Amino acid sequence: MTIQSIVENELVDDGHSVWLLNDHREFGYSDGAESEQYLDKVFRSAKDLSSRSSELEGHIKDWPSEYHLTSKRSQLLSGFTFDRSSRVLAVGCGCGAITRFLGETFDSVVSIEGSINRARLARLRTRDLDSVSIVCAPFQKIRFSQKFDIIFCIGVYEYSGWFVDGQDPYDAVLRYFADLLAPDGIVVLAIENQFGLKYFSNSREDHLGTMFEGIEGYHRHPGRVRTFGKVELESNLRKYFPCVEFYYPYPDYKLPDCVVSGQFLASQRAGELVSQSKSRDYSGPRQVFWDESTAALE
């Protein structure tokens, strides 16, 4: 199926094989012009764009480039078995690291990104994959003619308060996903843990760069961006999805060393494995007050 047959809105090609809504308006999320220009240069010159590309990893020079170029991004999903024929929607594709893996794994992927610069980078990363269509638009404005078997929302849900209007944007996003899901379909959602161990010790909140912001309830920056603990997240999800299953990437979903099931996490074997994963403060250097790996064993 073509993207025009899947999306009911009028679409226009921006000249870079990215599809735009006819009334496209720019979304201002960015890692910065310098970072995006660097990725553009790397992707254009790369011969191996795959999700496991050591060539791309050789161009890592800082945290933004590591996030977009490391093969660890795909490790979040590579341990799961998927049906290749599943109809897939990816919401918030960024610069294409996860979308690249999805395009290698599925025959049909529609990936949405609000920023035109990041959407073009995602298209460059997936330029050899005919299975992938990149649409630059606010996802909630797109009307689809089909349901999806799997919806991936990786590192996006926490920004709902930023780009979705309404009294409860986090609820609105989940309701949108539920309406788009085929019978027996699934939503794969990855988000940081509001009460992650590193936040009680020596790390600033990943999005806002403020110590203890999440564990104190985001009262300094209400309505901008927020993560959730397991209890609240599960409560949100069960309003629309009766079956909720948790998996735990360590140290986090961004750069996972391993992904374990809830059942394994409850076993006596889990502590030794997850204690080997070292968390990071992505805002910069941190002072270590106590050993997280030892605490994980407890």
What function would you assign to each model-found segment?
Residues 95-106:
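Conserved SAM-binding loop of SAM-dependent methyltransferases across substrates and taxa
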Residues 232, 249-298:
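Rossmann-like AdoMet/SAM-dependent catalytic core
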Residues 222-246:
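Short alpha-helix
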Residues 1-48:
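N-terminal auxiliary segments of SAM/dcSAM-dependent transferases
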Residues 168-186:
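A short glycine-rich, Lys/Arg-flanked "PGG" loop and its adjoining helix->strand segment in the class I
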Residues 143-151:
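A short acidic, Gly/Pro-enriched loop at the edge of an enzyme's catalytic core
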Residues 188-211:
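Conserved class I S-adenosyl-L-methionine
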Residues 105-132, 138-140:
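Class I SAM-dependent methyltransferase SAM/SAH-binding core
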